[in-house]
Amino acid sequence: MDTDALEHRFLEGDQRALARAITLVESGYPEGQELLKRLRGRLSAKVVGLTGSPGAGKSTLSDRLIEALRKRGETVAVLAVDPSSPFTGGAILGDRIRMMRHHGDPGVYIRSLASRGALGGLAGATVASLSLLEAFGFDRILVETVGVGQSEVDIARVADTTVLILTPAAGDAVQAFKAGVMEIADLFVVNKFDLPGGERVVQELKTTLELAAAHPSGWKPSVLTAVAPKGEGLEALLEALDAHSAHLEERGLLESDRLERARFEVESVIQEWGRRRTREGLVLIGRVAAGQLTPEEAAQQLLGLPAGRLEGVSD
């Protein structure tokens, strides 16, 4: 692999080079890390996280956002994080199929990443891929997560603006309240608002937000409505996204967002390294199950530590 040639094509705006670079990073090749080192921090895009329960219409909303942003002259990239099979590691890469109508538009790039067991709903390579997309020069990057739940708050650590998408479906809003994901959202969108119960969900959200503690950044989250297949509510959503971006700039919060993203990326690398070492240590785990090793001894061998040097284990 000629890293110099790939970097040159990348900087020339060749999307095939971008795709190759992301593949190298996602697969863990050293060439991918070398490219990241050379390209990180070149440009900064507006990063929007889209999260919500399965069936909330995230992909349809993403598709319509691409259309609306392109009409404004913005270039757009989408990272759609798909669920992985717990057995094969394969992903159901359906999001990209829904948005294939934008294929051929040089101002649009869509990529699906498999979550591969990432607890926060984000693939381990998501932030690294995000850095490559920024270096490529996209104006706006949409990151669509697997779903929503107690562990899926990682999106708020990656995105500048986090959009929580709900529907009038019974229990959808209540589940969001219980799961604690209310705190991660900068904007709320009740999609499929034309279905029965839409107004009820909007009122529930507004009431809950009025009682909630003030947002740390001083931002007051908005509750919006949309019917994504018809394009309804898209203009209001774009205005709200612009308003939040302006708020971050005025308060000087973009730098802290980037710092939090870097912290998340380092933590993700450490977690992925740990998962990889665990897979490599299946033999040791088998020996623990057979009573031949203690868990501490197995962990010491996995980490390459001398006996008795595993910190954090009680005496």
Name the predicted role of every residue range.
Residues 2-56, 62-151, 155-173:
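Nucleotide-state-sensitive switch-loop elements of NTP-binding domains
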Residues 6-7, 113, 189, 222-226, ...:
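Short hinge/gating elements
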Residues 92, 129, 154, 158, ...:
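Alpha-helical scaffold elements adjacent to nucleotide-binding pockets in ATP/GTP-utilizing enzyme cores
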Residues 225, 236-310:
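Long, well-ordered amphipathic alpha-helical subdomains in the mid-to-C-terminal portions
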Residues 4-9, 15, 50, 54, ...:
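Expand to "…catalyze enediolate/carbanion chemistry for C-C bond making/breaking, isomerization
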Residues 187, 193-247:
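Canonical P-loop GTPase G-domain recognition
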